[in-house]
A protein has these predicted regions:
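N-terminal signal peptide c-region/cleavage motif recognized by signal peptidases
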Residues: 13-14
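Positively charged n-region of N-terminal signal peptides that target proteins for export
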Residues: 1-4
């Protein structure tokens, strides 16, 4: 099963730096305040419901935070196979900077379990991974200011999205480094998710090849209302918000 991207996206399965291009002047009052929340999603593939997902942000001691994304197969072959995937990133936040400290990924089925743990050592300026990861991806990888995991990039997109804006981030996650570029549509669009109508900003990740990632963002909602990943024009993962609440 693929890493959760919009990450990588999300999801799972997504930084250049934590700056945006172009970037209007930002004041302290413009920066969205990070707050804990729990959001529930239904997961679709090819238009068919496969399971459920939960994204949450948790406040920790010592001014640290944790963001989690958990997916569980509840229907069809995904349920029979016991598909269960989890990603977490512990991080600190200083204004507009979300700095990853540790990362964990667990993928489970009835017969298998794979786990990867990553450590972002900012004093040493490098990141390393251990567990069920290819030797070529264990690191160390050199860190740059603004580097983020895929889950943190999801939060950054929510924070930074404005109509017509271009967002650039450097993704450092699971032993890989990639530059991620997103473009926010000039005009908001009407979107219906789980029977609820929203006026949302469409954010497209600019990718090469046959992959496409789209995130829909609503002002005042701390999590994407929809996260869609496509390959060759076909939906591979589609997370649609059911509900969210502050904690």
């Amino acid at each position: 099963m693929k890493s959760l991207l919009i990450a990588a996206c999300l999801l799972l399965p997504c930084g250049i730096t934590c700056a945006q291009d172009p970037v209007p002047a930002t004041t302290t009052s413009d920066v969205a305040v990070l707050e804990p929340f729990v959001a529930s999603y239904e997961v679709f593939r090819g238009g068919k419901s496969l399971g459920e997902a939960t994204m949450q942000v948790v406040s920790l001691p010592a001014r640290r935070w944790r963001v989690d994304l958990m997916m569980r197969g509840t229907r069809g072959l995904f349920a029979m196979a016991g598909v269960n995937a989890e990603q977490s990133t512990v991080f600190d936040a200083n204004g507009e900077t979300y700095r990853p400290l540790t990362q964990a990924t667990v993928n489970k089925t009835v017969f298998t379990q794979k786990k990867t743990i990553g450590v972002y050592d900012w004093r040493a300026g490098s990141a390393t991974w251990q567990g069920d990861v290819k030797e070529s991806r264990t690191g160390p990888l050199s860190l740059q200011g603004g580097d983020m995991s895929g889950l943190l990039i999801n939060l950054a997109v929510i924070r930074d999205a404005e109509p017509g804006r271009t967002l650039q981030y450097r993704f450092v996650d699971n032993g890989r480094v990639r530059n991620h570029r997103y473009v926010v549509a000039d005009e908001p669009e009407s979107v219906s998710v789980a029977g609820i109508g929203y006026t949302a900003m469409r954010v497209d990740r600019i990718e090469q090849g046959n992959e496409e990632t789209v995130i829909w963002v609503v002002k005042g909602v701390p999590t994407p209302i929809r996260m869609l990943q496509r390959e060759d024009g076909m939906d591979t993962y589609d997370l649609r918000l059911i509900e969210y609440k502050g904690v």
